[in-house]
């Protein structure tokens, strides 16, 4: 027998399920936020801006497909760090696909969607973009750990890599699925977002806070990576001659430029959207006109998925060569096992070991044995 206390819960669940299939809810929420009139006046098929955005998304999809093909076809890239780069390419590819679908289902088509379909349309974007940002954080964590240990990760660390990658997707799915699981404003019209009329403002604030913390974490990790490299470079100046010290300083400056590019692009792509979402939380309905231009801010964040393959892949010399071979429809190299394997530590940086690292001699202090060399943004550790 169902208890009296559970009856309200059952009724609420039934009401929520019925609301998810109610077409009128979309119209009601868009009308409340002022987006309904905008849609009626301007939406006559696909807008020119939408066509441009779709073309950009197609380019993003293609370049990330080539990155995945490069990693898949090149055996020497079947290593933990490249799994992270492959995961980033996959999430960026899905971001391009999700935004293309979002654009095709926008405009007048929006009012033909049920709330459940609307949540899937927007939630897929949140999942893909969240996975992309979490992947950037995972890469920063992996490279920071690599710098701390000053040695290549062996196969035993594959489990940690897959654990981090799995965590990226699980957290992203949960984050993107919260609205359809109940954290929405269907029953509270006054709490609705203007940018996303079925999303609760508290959810928007929560997501903005999470992404801001991720951004700060990535900035801190890359600053720490540069600090570690700079510190080890200074140690060498006390043991090497003036010419080597000067050369080390120049290469450290090149590394700093690489870090600045990475962080500047990331902040430039995401900060405008963060600011817009904070305005959305603070503004009442129909009071902030800038909120009706949200697609320009969102496409800027999606553009980050187009810059990631350039920054995180093509700055690696070996990946760049393999990438060009894939594009040229040539066979990918099987990899020279006798050669040095280079692993990126930060974008545009590669990490390698000399053969003497495999000797039976015990490892000495950083200042005694491993010489940290920074050239053109590439970091190598050699004996």
Swiss-Prot record:
Record-annotated membrane-spanning stretches: 48-69, 84-105, 118-139, 162-183, 198-225, 259-279, 291-311
Supply the CDD domains for this chain: 7tmA_S1PR1_Edg1 (cd15346)
PROSITE patterns hit by this protein: G_PROTEIN_RECEP_F1_1, G_PROTEIN_RECEP_F1_2
Q: Which residues carry this modification: N6-acetyllysine?
A: 11
Stretches assigned to the Extracellular side = 1-47, 106-117, 184-197, 280-290
Q: Which UniProt keywords apply?
A: Acetylation, Angiogenesis, Cell membrane, Chemotaxis, Disulfide bond, Endosome, G-protein coupled receptor, Glycoprotein, Lipoprotein, Membrane, Palmitate, Phosphoprotein, Receptor, Transducer, Transmembrane, Transmembrane helix
Disulfide bond annotation, renumbered to this chain: 185-192, 283-288
Q: Report if keyword Membrane is assigned.
A: yes
What's one Pfam family here? 7tm_1
Q: How is it modified after translation?
A: Palmitoylated by ZDHHC5. Palmitoylation is required for targeting to plasma membrane, enabling G(i) coupling.
Q: Which SMART domains match?
A: 7TM_GPCR_Srsx
| Single annotated GO MF | G protein-coupled receptor binding
Q: Which residues are glycosylated?
A: 31
Q: Where in the sequence is Phosphoserine found?
A: 352, 354
- What are the recorded Gene Ontology BP terms? actin cytoskeleton organization; adenylate cyclase-activating G protein-coupled receptor signaling pathway; adenylate cyclase-inhibiting G protein-coupled receptor signaling pathway; angiogenesis; blood vessel maturation; brain development; cardiac muscle tissue growth involved in heart morphogenesis; cell migration
Modified sites of kind Phosphothreonine? 237
Question: Membrane side Cytoplasmic: which residues?
Answer: 70-83, 140-161, 226-258, 312-383
Q: What does this protein do?
A: G-protein coupled receptor for the bioactive lysosphingolipid sphingosine 1-phosphate (S1P) that seems to be coupled to the G(i) subclass of heteromeric G proteins. Signaling leads to the activation of RAC1, SRC, PTK2/FAK1 and MAP kinases. Plays an important role in cell migration, probably via its role in the reorganization of the actin cytoskeleton and the formation of lamellipodia in response to stimuli that increase the activity of the sphingosine kinase SPHK1. Required for normal chemotaxis toward sphingosine 1-phosphate.
Query: What does the record note on quaternary structure?
Result: Interacts with GNAI1 and GNAI3. Interacts with CD69; this interaction promotes S1PR1 degradation.
Stated family: Belongs to the G-protein coupled receptor 1 family.
Q: What is the protein name stated in its UniProt record?
A: Sphingosine 1-phosphate receptor 1
Source organism per entry reads Rattus norvegicus
């Amino acid at each position: 027998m169902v208890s009296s206390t559970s009856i309200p819960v059952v009724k609420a669940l039934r009401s929520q399920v019925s609301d998810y299939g109610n077409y009128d809810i979309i119209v009601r929420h868009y009308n409340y936020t002022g987006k309904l009139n905008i849609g009626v006046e301007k939406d006559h098929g696909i807008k020119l801006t939408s066509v441009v955005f779709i073309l950009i998304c197609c380019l993003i999809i293609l370049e990330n497909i080539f990155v995945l093909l490069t990693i898949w076809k090149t055996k020497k890239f079947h290593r933990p760090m490249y799994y992270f780069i492959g995961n980033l390419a996959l999430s960026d590819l899905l971001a391009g696909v999700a935004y293309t679908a979002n654009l095709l289902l926008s405009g007048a088509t929006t009012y033909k969607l049920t709330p459940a379909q609307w949540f899937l349309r927007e939630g897929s974007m949140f999942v893909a973009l969240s996975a992309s940002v979490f992947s950037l954080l995972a890469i920063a964590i992996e490279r920071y750990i690599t710098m701390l240990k000053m040695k290549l990760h062996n196969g035993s660390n594959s489990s940690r890599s897959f654990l981090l990658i799995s965590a990226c997707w699980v957290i992203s799915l949960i984050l993107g699925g919260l609205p359809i699981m109940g954290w929405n404003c269907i029953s509270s019209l006054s709490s609705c977002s203007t940018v996303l009329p079925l999303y609760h403002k508290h959810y928007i604030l929560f997501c903005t806070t999470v992404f801001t913390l991720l951004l700060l974490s990535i900035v801190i990790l890359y600053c720490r990576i540069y600090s570690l490299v700079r510190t080890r470079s200074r140690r060498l100046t006390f043991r090497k001659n003036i010419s080597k010290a000067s050369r080390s300083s120049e290469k450290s400056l090149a590394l700093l430029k690489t870090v600045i590019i990475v962080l500047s692009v990331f902040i430039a792509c995401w900060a405008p959207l963060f600011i817009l979402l904070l305005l959305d939380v603070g503004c009442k309905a129909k009071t902030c006109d800038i909120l009706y231009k949200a697609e320009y801010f969102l496409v800027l964040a999606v553009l980050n998925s187009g810059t990631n393959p350039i920054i995180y892949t093509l700055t690696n010399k070996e990946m760049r060569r393999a990438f060009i071979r894939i594009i040229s429809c040539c066979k990918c190299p099987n990899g020279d096992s006798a050669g040095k394997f280079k692993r990126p530590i930060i974008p545009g940086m590669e990490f390698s070991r000399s053969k003497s690292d495999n000797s039976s001699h015990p490892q000495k202090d950083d200042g005694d044995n491993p010489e940290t060399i920074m050239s053109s943004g590439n970091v190598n550790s050699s004996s």
